[in-house]
Amino acid sequence: MNGAGKKVVVVTNSSSYEPRAEWVGELFKQQGAQVLWVETDFIHREKVKKVRSAPDHMYIDTVPYRKNLSVRRLYSQYDFARKAEKILEKEQADMVYMILPANSLAAAGDRIKRKMNRTVLVFDILDLWPESLGGKKLQKLWPFQCWRRLRDDHLKAADLVITECHYFQKFINAKQEKTAVVYWPKEVPEGWKMEIPENKAPENQVPVLESQTASENADINVGVSTPAVIHFAYLGSINNIIDIDGIVNFLEITGKMTPVFLHVVGDGENRGLFEEKLKSKGIKAEFYGAVYEEAVKAEIFSRCMFGINMMKPGVCVGLTMKSIDYFCYGLPLVNNIPGDTWELVKQEQIGINYRPDAALKCAQELLALAQSGRIKEIKYKMQSLYMKLFTQEAAENVIRERVFLLLEGGPK
């Protein structure tokens, strides 16, 4: 595809989604397109405004907020969408690539499409609000129904609706031929290598390797040589949607059968609550805070056997960023995320799918897996899936096949 002479505007109101926006925009630039990024001057994680400047970027003066779920945050998103719409009217781009949420951006995109019908409109849905907040009763409340419709009622305006996972497509009203899935890619870390077992079996077979002994794992036992300890990693924000009670309950049950230790890489408003609940059940843990250096993260993960990927029941998520890190570093999953992740765990046999009504059975399954001698093979399988599904190259292939062709051919 030759993008020479084409103008693309990439819009996101969330600093958390900027890596996706920057990556997509750079792909367009590589094709010769002129790219403008419209982003925010408010840093979501830190809850502060910053003076920002970069070539080919416009930073919208964004209304600050303190709470993630608040009327002020919704107003901030509405105000951002209104200002972004004015910028788009002036730019007259060949393509507008909008990252959702905010849901109010979908409404703005619809209005832009009506005014400039020759513009290609792409929505890239990275989260579902309010569905990802969980709670069936909550979803039925009138304000939340309006919030959801702010997105759903305007999806039909898009020439293409991208979702971050297949699971999201069950909840949106978009024609299948106008949808695509682009997983959030993770760049292959510097120095990364696959852990290939010596007697790797064909991919359609489940190999049985020699069991790892306690002495072989002595370096990951955090000072404990006997009995052996099963080390778990939890990576990511410690917020109101992670299943703290489920994680603690599972570790408590498992801990009655064998010693356990939890490594927590992340931070958030519920860190104190998480620490208290672990301590109350006698579960040993270490909190490292937010870690962004891949080498540090890799070193922590090298001490762990499993990665915990659990959110509260009802939260509408099919794939998490933490799970992609687990795939990258080959940590078998303790998972309760439905959709894409649940099916991968089930079909590829790369961990256990946790069910709260069968917590004891799940703990027994995990212990059997830990003692099966299959961990090395599962690590290799997970890293193979990472290379196939979650690298930048894998995501770029979809962008080339679906998005670049739209830019070249115009609206459908």
Predicted features by range, described:
Residues S104-A107, R111-M116, W142-V161:
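Membrane-proximal helix-turn-helix segments that form the acceptor-binding/catalytic region
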Residues R148-V181, V188-K193, E343:
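A short, active-site helix/loop in glycosyltransferases that binds the activated sugar's phosphate group
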